[in-house]
Amino acid sequence: MSSWFLSLDNAAVLIDCPKVTEEVINDLKELSGGICPNVVLTNRDAHHDASILNRKLGWPLIVQEQEAYLLPHVENLVTFSEELTLSSGARLLWTPGPTPGSCVLHVPPPWNVLFCGRLLTPGSNDQISPIRTRSTFHWTMYQESLLKLRNWLPREQPPLLASGQRLHLLSDEKLLPWIAWNPSAE
């Protein structure tokens, strides 16, 4: 799972949580510049490390309510059901399928990036698409979430795409253009 740290105009957001080590803790403290970033978890893969980070730094964790039970002793736990807008203007959308509480985060222009966690996975030819695996929670819900996501995003300016999965397949590219989303794979 890949993590992303965003320094926005009036806030910071850590999207998914890296493996927590002392070096990572020090790097995150430096990146945060003394503010208290929100930690958004797009799926349950990083819950253990996120709870350690929360305990060490006190940063609030934001999860979709379906997965809040996995973080019983976390302070500053923020949950949402369908959608949530952060103070930075970034918006979260519940997109069940990969896990019951999967979500995506859209950061509006000027950044205009969709952080899609495990919802969309890089493949060959710089394409990104849904992948059904043994650990996929519910394939029909997954497909419905993809349709809901397409209707939720602003159509006038499609976002860049950032996946939390297997970035090494993307060679040097970290963000993909909207047209890399392969709807035929759905």
Set out the residue ranges of the language-model regions.
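Metallo-beta-lactamase
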Residues: 11-20, 91-94, 99-185
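Short hydrophobic/charged patches on amphipathic alpha-helices used for structural packing
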Residues: 3, 25-29, 93
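Residue-level marker for the onset of beta-strands and adjacent loop->beta junctions
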Residues: 2, 80, 101-103
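Generic structural signal for well-ordered alpha-helical scaffold segments
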Residues: 5, 29, 147-151
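Residue-level preference for short coil/turn positions at secondary-structure junctions
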Residues: 8-10, 35, 57, 86-88, ...
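Active-site HxH/HxHxD metal-binding segment of metal-dependent hydrolases
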Residues: 18-88, 181-185
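Short, compositionally biased "basic patch" segments
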Residues: 1-7
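A generic structural signal for short, solvent-exposed coil/turn residues
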Residues: 7, 53, 72, 84, ...
